[in-house]
């Protein structure tokens, strides 16, 4: 790998060999902090970076409250070691009809009410762990951490392999936790609570290298205010994008990046 120093408007990023852990902390300087989740969005589609960081557009999360409620239930189940009974799973699956986050929280409380006197909370199950890394130029509130391992959650009634962007998201979570707790983390988890399935995801050096490389690519786009390539439209992906309403290009046969 070329070891020359690349400079973008005074922001220097060292393009040199990565350590076996997947990244090199020396001589790495960033002008801004970027959320790990936004890096995953960039991998999903580079135009999301322009929309958010250059044009100040807002993503729309129509099921955000539903996700937060389901996450809270999932967290409570792990925290207190309560097995999700079939009737609970059935109620969770019916979450679409529930209009308020309060109802989810009430359900989560009910799940542990019968166990609160006999079951102690697991201190190794953490929620919304906030980490800010000067070395990586990344910050995030990690939704779920179990025994120091990051977890990504899928509240769907199927089990599909985690996408590449979600693997990078998990990797960035691991890098942040490694720095916060001064430990090595070699794997995380993808969990499917509605299916009672948990998969271990290895966080290897390639994923680590890719995560840091993608973060550097985002920095370049933000500074230059453009993406120097065209991205074919994938209708299935575009229809699930949180920036769809703000994207002026997705209905075309090809997304062109000009700002």
Q: What do these predicted ranges mean?
A:
Residues 123-137, 161-164, 179-259:
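Metal-dependent nuclease catalytic regions and adjoining charged, substrate-binding loops involved
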Residues 143, 153, 169:
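Acidic active-site catalytic centers that drive phospho-/nucleotidyl reactions
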Residues 57, 158-161:
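Short, surface-exposed beta-strand-loop junctions and turns on beta-sheet-rich folds
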Residues 151-158:
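Structural signature of nuclease core domains in nucleic-acid processing machines
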Residues 1-150, 259:
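Metal-dependent nuclease catalytic cores that hydrolyze phosphodiester bonds in DNA/RNA
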Residues 56-57, 175-180:
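Active-site catalytic microenvironments for nucleophilic, acid-base chemistry
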Residues 166-177:
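Short, charged, amphipathic alpha-helix that recurs within catalytic cores of restriction-modification
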